[in-house]
Amino acid sequence: MQIKNADVYVGGNKILKSLNWSMSEEENWAVIGNNGTGKTTFMKLIFGELIPVYGGKVRWFGNKGRIPLSEVREKIGYVSAEYQSNYDRPALGWEVVASGHFSSIGLHGDVTQKQKGVAFDSMSYLGIEYLSYTPYRQMSYGEARRILLARAMVHRASLMILDEPCTGLDIPTRETFLETMEKMSRKGTRMIYVTHRIEEIMPCFTHVLYLKNGKVFKQGRKEAMMNTKTLSRALDCSITVEKNFNRYYAAIGYKK
């Protein structure tokens, strides 16, 4: 994955500015920044929902030429709190998951037995097959989020985009979700994870990208990026970064 000199406009406003970034097939990235720094726009650029202007380029999966967006999206799963709030169609759990085959909100065609089987396999992998026949609207917030993760998996995505996926989850549900991500990473799924909570950066993540005012503030290996000075400057706040049990935690204010 490679982005070169990307300027991205949304509604006439320049959100991303001269952005350069690349990701190899063995890396998982966490993307950190305050609200309004362009994190979600960055994810939509990677997913192909937005395109750069003025000669900016996006290359997916090593392809140097043009590649149909339909092929790109078959290889990318996308989960976000925003998408969850937009999925308002009446549907059972398995139907929501199966809609991932069509990249649609709701089912707009017949589902083959093979497609249905893949949907059930995805739910089983995440341990949520018990939600197969539960109406989506009756699920808890955390259950619905995990259903959408299963939906993103039906294409056997090689890259998973997770845009603040733990927003609104309580601590036990969040930890279950994060443990699922670790499991997926061990199975070979690569991830880009947007957050402003560093405790969500699991051991599987290898690199960190900081966005600030629509630009790359700093990027590199996680061990070099996760420190008090860098995080404080990136978020314009005095923050102490600590590490415990291979996870990072933030506290407001510097240690004296």
Show where each model-derived region lies.
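Conserved ABC transporter NBD signature motif
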Residues: 55-66
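Conserved ABC ATPase "signature" region
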Residues: 98, 113-131
